[in-house]
Amino acid sequence: PTLIRSLQPHGADLARSCDLSSLVAFGSTGEPLNPDPWWWLFRDVGEGKIPIVNISGGTEIAAVILGVNLLQGLKPTSLGGPSLGMAADVVDAAGRPLRGEVGELVLRAPWPGMTRGFWKEPDRYLASYWDRFEGVWVHGDWASVDEDGFWFLHGRSDDTMNIAGKRVGPAEIESAAVGLDEVVAAAAIGVPDPVKGEAPVVYVVPSPEAAGDTAVADRVADEIVRVLGKAFRPAAVRVVEDLPRTRSAKIMRRVVRALALGDDPGDLSSLENPESLEGIGRL
């Protein structure tokens, strides 16, 4: 998704300048794929003919939890359904199966590539994945299953915000932001708010054409309100040159939030671009 968003400002002309005759599918993984980049890749680059194989797995999974089955058809940004051998489910806070709403992505049975533990840290392994529900692996992602059985991801469950009593994942807010042509990437975090409990703060990376445009932040805030409602108007929108990412291009929201609040960002061993931290700063 990060690569798609970075190419999107170049428009369809970029694809027209390349020989794509041997291309049979696009692959996407690492983080939720927002609707606007999905449609750009499918319609403008693939000309509506090349499927987007959106998958979700993890280093600790050593496999694919959710993946597209091209015989099943596609819905924009969907991940199809559980891959072979993966007893995936979406559950509520009590561990009950949930459909049509956002819940925790879990696995109810072992799988061939299952991680057995963390090196010399067995207690941390159990606390990370097995403490919530007995005999159930909690992956740490928000997911949902729609009325047609298609699965969707909504970001990390530990990144969830509670804004005026409404739970929202960063993916919803970020999708609204990157729906603007001026925005290449976004990271949404929640910060303490005396009225709402939490308020969203959004960091955005502008497109090359919008770099230096002082009105980008206002347009991002207005677009989030238009898409999600007035309750989700950001307390602040910060324009930055880059966002901290792991080597697999995942945005490190916990680091963004820690820096914004003046807290210790913790372990940075997986940070790929340390120079990005300079632009975050404290709120």
Annotate each predicted stretch with a short phrase.
Residues 9-10, 121, 164:
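Residue-level signal for well-ordered alpha-helical positions
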Residues 14-17, 68-73, 204-205:
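Short, hinge-like loop/turn segments at secondary-structure boundaries
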Residues 24-26, 32-150, 157-160, 173:
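Conserved AMP-binding/adenylate-forming
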